[in-house]
């Protein structure tokens, strides 16, 4: 299922000390390949894949990745234990390092299929799902969730949820430190309107010291990560990592103690070029890859031109790689 297009490398040990969140339409395999050039140790997540899509759709497309993406987790959306178990087995067979259950997405579309944050109202079902997956595979099974949903947002109810899922065998919880409001707000508003409550997640870590608790929501700097790591076991960044990807270049040294020098922006792009050539040779368009790297150029002369080349000009070019090389020149020495 994987795309062995880069030389085999020793896999780094899976650590959740720092990860990039699963994000629909963003953390596809091209995005993940790019982010991996910047950080060797960051745990990467796929976009959420529903059990129905994996069991009845184009399985190879949903599971495909490049070997360099490890450590790599597949996020699943679903609520039928047997289906989740079958999908977890597919993930393990494809070589994924972890499978994660989405109990945090608030969109109406997934709620109708009993996927995402609405499952926080059904802790026994989530526990059954987790147990089914754990019984099916040897790889890690984790859960990403909110601190509550409207109508079930007390701390006692959060502890009930975590407690039941822990009893099923889950040992790692990624906590988006907001409640999800299941009616009346868009997914975007659900990332902004409910207030961040890091203190609730911190209390959860205090009351469940045996569990690995990873904090997610509103974190924008590695300095903030280091501060929160005094309380939590790991940090997960989402949109900030996507819009400001060069932040990842300092992750290995600042959070994992690596002595390897950080990659420059231009070096990251040079590493991306052969990947783009392979994608084009398979019939793919260059913008499938380059749409994910626009945030690499920020705050210096030529940044705007860089983004224009790769978001506008690339669509009109007879030779898109020439446009890529023009963009690369703008990052020379950076």
What do the PLM-derived regions correspond to, one by one?
Residues 2-334:
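Flavin-dependent oxidoreductase catalytic cores
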């Amino acid at each position: 299922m994987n795309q062995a297009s880069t030389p085999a490398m020793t896999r780094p040990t899976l650590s959740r000390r720092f990860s990039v969140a699963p994000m629909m339409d963003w953390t596809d395999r091209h995005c993940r390949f790019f982010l991996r050039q910047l950080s060797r140790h960051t745990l990467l997540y796929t976009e959420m894949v529903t059990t129905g899509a994996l069991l009845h759709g184009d399985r190879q497309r949903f599971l495909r990745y490049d070997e360099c993406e490890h450590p790599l987790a597949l996020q699943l959306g679903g609520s039928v234990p047997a289906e989740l178990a079958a999908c977890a087995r597919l993930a393990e067979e494809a070589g994924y390092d972890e499978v994660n259950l989405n109990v945090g997405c608030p969109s109406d579309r997934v709620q109708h299929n009993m996927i995402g944050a609405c499952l926080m109202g059904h802790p026994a079902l989530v526990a059954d799902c987790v147990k089914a997956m754990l019984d099916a595979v040897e790889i890690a099974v984790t859960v990403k969730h909110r601190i509550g949903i409207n109508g079930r947002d007390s701390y006692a109810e959060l502890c009930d949820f975590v407690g039941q899922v822990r009893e099923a065998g889950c040992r790692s919880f990624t906590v988006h430190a907001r409640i999800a409001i299941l009616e009346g707000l868009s997914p975007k508003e659900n990332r902004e309107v409910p207030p961040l409550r890091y203190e609730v997640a911190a209390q959860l870590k205090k009351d469940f010291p045996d569990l690995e608790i990873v904090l997610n929501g509103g974190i924008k700097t590695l300095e903030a990560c280091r501060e929160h790591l005094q309380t939590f076991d790991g940090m997960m960044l989402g949109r900030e990592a996507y819009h400001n990807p060069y932040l990842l270049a300092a992750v290995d040294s600042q959070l994992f103690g690596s002595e390897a020098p950080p990659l420059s922006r231009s070096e990251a792009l040079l590493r991306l070029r052969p990947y783009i050539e392979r994608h084009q040779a398979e019939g793919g368009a260059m913008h499938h890859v380059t749409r994910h790297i626009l945030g690499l150029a920020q705050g210096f002369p030529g940044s705007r031109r860089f983004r224009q080349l790769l978001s506008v000009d690339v669509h009109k070019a007879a030779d898109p790689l020439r446009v890529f090389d023009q963009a690369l020149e703008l990052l020379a020495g950076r």
